[in-house]
Amino acid sequence: MRLISLTLLALRRLANQRALTACLLLGMTVAVAIASAIPAFVSSAQNRVLRRELADRTAGQIRLSGLAANTRLPLTFKFSYLGLGRALLSYDETLDLDAFMTERIAPRLELPVVRTVRYASTDPWAILPANETWRRYPLDDSQPLGYGSLDFITDLLGHIDLDTGRLPAGFPGAPEVTDDGEIEVMVGRAFSTKTGIQAGDMISLTRKDTVRVAVDLKTTREVQREYNILARVTAIWAPKNRNDAYWIIRPEVLEQDLTLSPEMMSRRISKIVERQFSLMIWSYELDDKALTVENVAGVVDRANALSVEAFEKNEQLTLNQFEMISALRNYLKRSQELILLMTLFCAPIFAVVLSFVVLVAGMVVRQQEGELAILRSRGASPLDIFYMYAAQGALLALIAVLIGVPLSFGVASLLASAITFLQFSPQPEWVTSLPPVSLRLAVAAAILGAAATLVPALSAARRTILGFGAERARSAGRPLWQRAWLDVLLLIPCAYATWQLRQAGSLVVFGTDVSQADPFKDPIRYLLPILTLTAAGLLASRFVPRLFGLLAALVSRIQPLTPIFLALRDLARSPKDYAGALLLLIFTLGIAAYGASLARTLDQHLIDTIYLDNGGDLRLIEVGISNKPDRQPGIPGQAAADDTEPEYLIFEPPEGHLEIEGIKRYARAARIPVRARNAGNRRNEDKSMLLAIDREEFARIAARGLRDDYSYAPMGEIVNRLATRPDALLVERRFFAENGLTIGGKFVLDIGDFRAAGPVTYTVADAFDVFPIVAGSEADYETGNFFVANAAYTFERMGKELPYDIVAETDPAANVEKMVQDAQELGFIVINAYDSRSKILSEQQRPERQGLFGALTAGFLFMTALTVLGFAIYALLSFRRRAIELGVLRALGLSEGQTSIYVIGIQGALTLVGALVGTTLGVALSYIYVPAMQATGKLIAPVPPFLTRMAWDNVALIYFALAAALGFVIAASLGFLRRLRAFEAIKLGAV
């Protein structure tokens, strides 16, 4: 009964403070939504990764099958029986295997089966014209028209069209199979075109088999048997869509075979040839939408078990999808890693959300301190008080789960649609399902949020009416973490780890390097700045009261600033009252400044890297036509080779690229292997690269990839040095210094291309550190030497043109495949194309990158909203708590205007100091930790170097939000102040 009474009391207390209860519920709901969204996002992102990985692994399959490059291969398990001419099956044995697959394999594939396709084929038969058909062929009747297998495949009629004729007997709508009728088959259009066979023709099928028969009880001998079958071709068929995933055997292969019905095979063919089937395939297309992080391990284990069971049934029966199983294993591993990474990436969000919950819970407790003290004085135990708050937390946690889980669909879609910081894909990725682990994490987050609400209640539960009065009299006590020096203890390991990261580029714990090669998969690099910010923020909050005290001392003797002095003195004397709000401001501004700057730096570095590699929007790798085409040995009629004639290439005029729709301008960029000669005219054996360019157009096209920090001077000026003279040469600055070169000096490069070997003399015009195409990630930056020269002069000195790339500026809406096709139609031989925009988009869609940027975006939005809301609530409630002080000040003679300045001073000073401290720490973290993201990364290119970019515009958004909240709070406080009288303030303050 007592517990029921306490529960009802807890519910009434929640109802009486609806605003604070709603804020608590909001914080817990956000925590639940984020926790539940992480597995849903991971499942959605990794499903896309799986599709892409399967597509990459089956690219060879697509090429071999002749399917279109954009064909989607579904998640399919294929079991096959391959007799290879030795272990041929009879028709009854095929039925036995088919029953085994239907009863034992298909129902146990873990995922729903969308489509099943079964295929059976015999060894090839020689096909000859028969009866009257041979008269149409001027060939010796002993020469076969071709070779083809007898086969059948399920669901064929839904995927073919009949050019002529009717379906063979046994198919739906065709005559029934009879024991004495003709054997009827149909052939593909390709076979008909090749051989001239038409519907209605009679053909003869011949095959010879060697079988071993018993001579007596001890010996056997080989006997050759010949089989002959007469068959009528009743139809010519063609596939409706050659790129349909239905075709488990290439349509081009099936068109060369003879297709008949299973009934014809069983009733007629099997009576002539007992053992004939050499190939059978069972293809099970699975519902990949049902594949989740939870069940992928079961799918892999079940596939392995079924493969073993199939082998036990027949040694020739195997599961062919080894690459599929490998892809699923990678999917499982990466999904588990990504869940952990996303949890760690979202840790700052959880920290701020829990801080918000603790802050609001503390406000709730402070509003109820008087009631709690009275309850304790009237006999309630600390356990009763704790139970009331636990009941409140449990109820809020339950409601948060009910609201937060549906909201997690939106949060997961937000994460999945992020392509960079605060930018989303124009076609959002909607997450429509939650894996079971989402519910478990949602419950865990709700429990954690409920536990956070109990933290402020622990001390209040021990306080009686006397302790409450003493506590209200002065709030100068230091928080527990300050008394325990937690901030300093946390800052020491952070400082040591930071020193390691800055010095060695990696983190070493107990002699073990814990850093990862890919920073996107290295949460330590992301958590270290957050931990450092936490320690620095806690440490800074120690000195904020002293700062307020110092400022109060400075203005204490200035009479007009008396309200400001009083405000600063109150802030200096009662740090415990605003410690939570101050830390929330510091953490939010610090994390926002660091996170936004990290996101902008990573995003711009990706763009810089790709444009450094490509040189422009599009780079076409082209070759010319040699004057010495390859000659095949043994083929008569070829002209004799003239070994004395030099080889050269014939190119289409490059101006033709401007005729391609989408190309705005172009420039030639030839990558020519060279060897440099040093000051003693001795050849340097290091492999080097010369980039011969059309200077003027190249400078315009590559402007986006030319950063001024790529050399000691702006890169635009460096490139323009090539215009000073035709033989001008730009030299890598490292090589320039090591070899004692001088501007204006002559320098010789030995052309290494076999088509134009020989020295070319240049004049050194300037030096650079990094240059597009040659000094990007495609080149060996650590050991190679790179040079840049004018293409016209280089080709002239060589006496010919060498293969060059075309670097182009393109229309953003242009289709790259269409441009390549147009170039080929104009006669350009394009062997490859690199599109910068497509590459950027592909990299932005990496799950790890999406997860990081999605977490940064979601964290920025949620933390800003919660911090602004929490600060506004704190400010309004603190004003009510200061009502007695305001009444006393009014009674002592402060005017309404001076009291207003006092209120504005308290709120404004706290907001300004918290925001400035947080921003300062965020900026410092950006310049300390952002460059370390590039230290050991393989997927973050070492060239170009990181250029830390501060996202001041994003930080300004938080300042605007805080300013708006501060304005609202001040307006509300002043409105309340105007209606407040001294005796009412004292009465209110005593409540």
Residue ranges of model-derived segments:
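N-terminal Sec/SRP start-transfer signal
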Residues: M1-A35, E471-I492, S541-L589, S878, ...
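Membrane transport/envelope proteins' first extracytoplasmic loop
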Residues: M1-V353, M363, S417-S425, E429-T432, ...
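Interfacial "coupling" helices/loops that link adjacent transmembrane helices in transporter permeases
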Residues: Q17, S355-A397, R463, F468-L480, ...
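Selective detector of the "anchor" transmembrane alpha-helix that sits immediately C-terminal
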Residues: L341-M363, A444-L448, A855-L876, Y959-A964
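Small-residue-rich transmembrane alpha-helices
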Residues: V358-A361, G370, A394-P426, P436-I465, ...
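Membrane-interface segments at loop-to-transmembrane junctions
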Residues: P382, F386, A390, Q427-P435, ...
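Juxtamembrane segments of multi-pass membrane proteins
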Residues: A504-Y710, M715
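C-terminal transmembrane helical bundles of large multi-pass transporters
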Residues: L582, Y804-I806, I829-G922, S926-P931, ...
